[in-house]
Structure formats: structure tokens, C-alpha cells
């Protein structure tokens, strides 16, 4: 089962660190289940110290069953342009203001969960809103489990007027 849960991450900033530290710390994922791509050597060093594979090539993260998009919304277009034409796995986006429609249009991804964690995730006391309505039951369960590792989770339905 662990091999099916391989998680690729693009973006190794604060929220990615909090989420992955929680998932590893709670035993939801092992460090060997994860690969993180980040252009910053310091970020890669942080993850390598956790035992996580860390690379600078975003394409390596696409080889996983799940992809956590943890980049700043303003840099998403650069990442999407770089990966245009690639096959995307199930996407979990923590980018504020980027709709599933926009992510799909930019990447071609067909299965996307939008997630909005908050800063207390870094100490395991977060509250995360999850819209996993595009995912099947197993993938939705994975997303919920991932964010339960860093706090409480509330499932939300997609509403056009809500911009997570």
C-alpha cells in the first residue's frame, strides 16, 4: 500500500515542511514515500535531513501517484509552463486563489483536490479545508489522512463564490 501512496511535492517552503513533517511524524507516510522538488538548495537540504529525496527537477515529482502543488500562486504559471505536456498524477493544491479549473487548464490534470491549510499545521494543531470532490473515494481518503496528520480537517463543497 505504501508504494501506491508515493507523494511528489513541488515547492519545499514552510507549508510543505509542516505537512510532510506531520505526515512522517504521525507515520502516515515514510520519508522513502516522498520526493520533493525545489530550486533552493537550502530547502532540499532540509528534506534530505528528514530522509526525503530532494531534487531540483519538477518532472521527478510527477512520477508519483499524488502530487502536492505547494508553490506560491504567483509562481504557478512558471511551473505549469515548465511541465506543459507532461502527465499529471492526482493533484493536491495548497495554492490560494487557484481554482481547480485554472489548475486543470494549465496542467491538463483531471483529478484535483484544493486544500487550504493554516499556519498552526506546523505544530500539529491546524485546521484545513479540503475540497476533494473531483477524486474517487481512495484518493479523497488519502488527502484527508494527509491533512489529519497536521490537525483537524473540514470537507467543503466547491462553490464559485468561495476562493480558497
List the model feature ranges, each with a label.
Residues 1-56, 125:
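NAD(P)+-binding Rossmann beta1-loop-alpha1 motif at the extreme N-terminus of oxidoreductases
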Residues 14, 41-42, 74-75, 98, ...:
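Short alpha-helical
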Residues 18, 46, 78-79, 102, ...:
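Phosphate- and divalent-cation-binding pockets in alpha/beta enzyme and binding domains
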Residues 20-21, 77, 104, 144:
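Predominant activation on well-ordered alpha-helical scaffold segments within soluble catalytic domains
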Residues 35, 41, 50, 59-128:
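Rossmann-like NAD(P)(H) cofactor-binding subdomain of soluble oxidoreductases
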Residues 53-59, 154-156:
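Short acidic-hydrophobic, aromatic-tinged amphipathic segments that line or gate anion-handling sites
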Residues 102-111, 127-164:
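Internal alpha-helical scaffold of NAD(P)-dependent oxidoreductase catalytic cores
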Amino acid at each position: 500500500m505504501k508504494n501506491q501512496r508515493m507523494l511528489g511535492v513541488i515547492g519545499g517552503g514552510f507549508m510543505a515542511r509542516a505537512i510532510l513533517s506531520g505526515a512522517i511524524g504521525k507515520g502516515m507516510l515514510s520519508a522513502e514515500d516522498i520526493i520533493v522538488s525545489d530550486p533552493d538548495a537550502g530547502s532540499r537540504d532540509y528534506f534530505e535531513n528528514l530522509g526525503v529525496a530532494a531534487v531540483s527537477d519538477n518532472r521527478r515529482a510527477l512520477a508519483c501517484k499524488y502530487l502536492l502543488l505547494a508553490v506560491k500562486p504567483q509562481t504557478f504559471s512558471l511551473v505549469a509552463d515548465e511541465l506543459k505536456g507532461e502527465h499529471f498524477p492526482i493533484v493536491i493544491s495548497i495554492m490560494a486563489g487557484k481554482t481547480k479549473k485554472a489548475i486543470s487548464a494549465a496542467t491538463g490534470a483531471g483529478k484535483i483536490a484544493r486544500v487550504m491549510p493554516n499556519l498552526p499545521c506546523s505544530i500539529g494543531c491546524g485546521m484545513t479545508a479540503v475540497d476533494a470532490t473531483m477524486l474517487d473515494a481512495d484518493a479523497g481518503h488519502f488527502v484527508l489522512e494527509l491533512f489529519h496528520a497536521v490537525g483537524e480537517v473540514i470537507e467543503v463543497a466547491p462553490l464559485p463564490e468561495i476562493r480558497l
